[in-house]
Structures are given as structure tokens and as C-alpha cells.
Swiss-Prot record:
Keywords: Ribonucleoprotein, Ribosomal protein, RNA-binding, rRNA-binding. Part of the 50S ribosomal subunit. The keyword Transmembrane helix does not apply. PROSITE patterns: RIBOSOMAL_L6_1. This protein binds to the 23S rRNA, and is important in its secondary structure. It is located near the subunit interface in the base of the L7/L12 stalk, and near the tRNA binding site of the peptidyltransferase center. It comes from the Bacteria. The lineage of its organism: Bacteria, Pseudomonadati, Thermodesulfobacteriota, Desulfovibrionia, Desulfovibrionales. Belongs to the universal ribosomal protein uL6 family. GO terms for cellular component: cytosolic large ribosomal subunit. It holds the Pfam family Ribosomal_L6. One of its GO terms (molecular function) is structural constituent of ribosome. This is Large ribosomal subunit protein uL6.
Length: 178
């Protein structure tokens, strides 16, 4: 039995879970999100909790059981609290601006890099060096943050680039002079 899958998911007040044939829809104060459901897994909603059941006991069914329980728990947390990732731009002359649904990155290229935010994602800049990405979909928030970091990943010699706020950059020693 999946240890993660057998735990019921508590539904906080203000959150509504609707189970369809092949999709589960979660609606809350921060928005709405839907997640597809594998046919091997079924959901039952009762007493402000959701239970995840699987049809058999094969290896794949056990894996899908825990996966779908975690995905639904992330959906419920996303529509009630939301998710966010904070990026920091490190380097002389490096800065970030948010203009509506666009992020403009000046990170040492000859031109500014424009990144258009997908639907459901919001960004806010704190000063010129910190950028917070937030939304209800945990996977999409992480993907957008990773794509922005990929524009100029931190380099190991001076630590310049775009990094997560809690990321530690492993530094290398420079060349040894004669």
C-alpha cells in the first residue's frame, strides 16, 4: 500500500473539489485548477476530505496511487494558499523589471531579454534584483522559475547570474598566478 496514497486529504473551508470521469477540478479563493486522472485511480469526497483509491495492486497502480494523491494535495494547497518562487539577479548592471505580463531581464547580453508570462502566473519585482513568481499551479510556477533561471544560470567563479533565493552556488577558485 502506498504510504502517501492512503492518507486522506483534508479540504479547507472555501475550497470545493469536483470529481469527474477523467478529471478532478478544485476551486478555491485563489482560483480554479483541474488535473487529469488516470483510470486506475478513483477519488471519493466525504466529510471535508478526499480519499484516493486504486483498482488493483500492481506496481504501476501503486505508483499512480501516490502520484495522484500528491497532485491533488498540491492543487488544494494551490487554490487555498498559492505557491511562489523567488529568484535573485546577481551581477553588476544586472536588473529585472516587470511590465504587465512581460518580464524584462537585463543580464549582460547586448539586448534585454523579454519573457512573456503564461496564463495563471503572476510576477512581482522587489527592487531591481529580486523577482517573485506566484500562482496556483505548483508545476507551472516551478517551470517558469526554471525557464527564467536558464536565461543566465549562475556561474561558479563570481556567482553572477539568476539564482533561486535559497540556492547556494558552489564557488571555484580562479587560476593560480605564477
Amino acid at each position: 500500500m502506498s504510504r502517501i496514497g492512503k492518507k486522506p486529504i483534508d479540504i479547507p473551508s472555501g475550497v470545493e473539489v469536483t470529481v469527474g470521469a477523467d478529471v478532478v477540478s478544485v476551486k478555491g479563493p485563489k482560483g480554479t485548477i483541474t488535473t487529469p486522472v488516470h483510470p486506475m485511480v478513483s477519488f471519493t469526497v466525504a466529510d471535508n476530505a478526499v480519499e484516493v483509491k486504486r483498482s488493483g495492486d500492481s506496481r504501476q497502480e501503486r505508483a499512480q496511487h501516490g502520484l495522484h494523491r500528491s497532485l491533488l494535495a498540491n492543487c488544494i494547497e494551490g487554490v487555498s494558499k498559492g505557491f511562489s518562487k523567488t529568484l535573485e539577479v546577481v551581477g553588476v548592471g544586472y536588473k529585472v523589471n516587470v511590465q504587465g505580463k512581460n518580464i524584462v531581464l537585463n543580464v549582460g547580453f547586448s539586448h534585454p531579454v523579454n519573457y512573456e508570462l503564461p496564463a495563471g502566473i503572476e510576477a512581482s519585482a522587489e527592487g531591481n534584483t529580486k523577482l517573485t513568481i506566484s500562482g496556483v499551479d505548483k508545476q507551472l510556477v516551478g517551470e517558469v522559475a526554471a525557464q527564467l533561471r536558464r536565461v543566465r544560470p549562475p556561474e561558479p567563479y563570481k556567482g553572477k547570474g539568476i539564482k533561486y533565493i535559497d540556492e547556494q552556488i558552489r564557488r571555484k577558485a580562479g587560476k593560480s598566478g605564477k
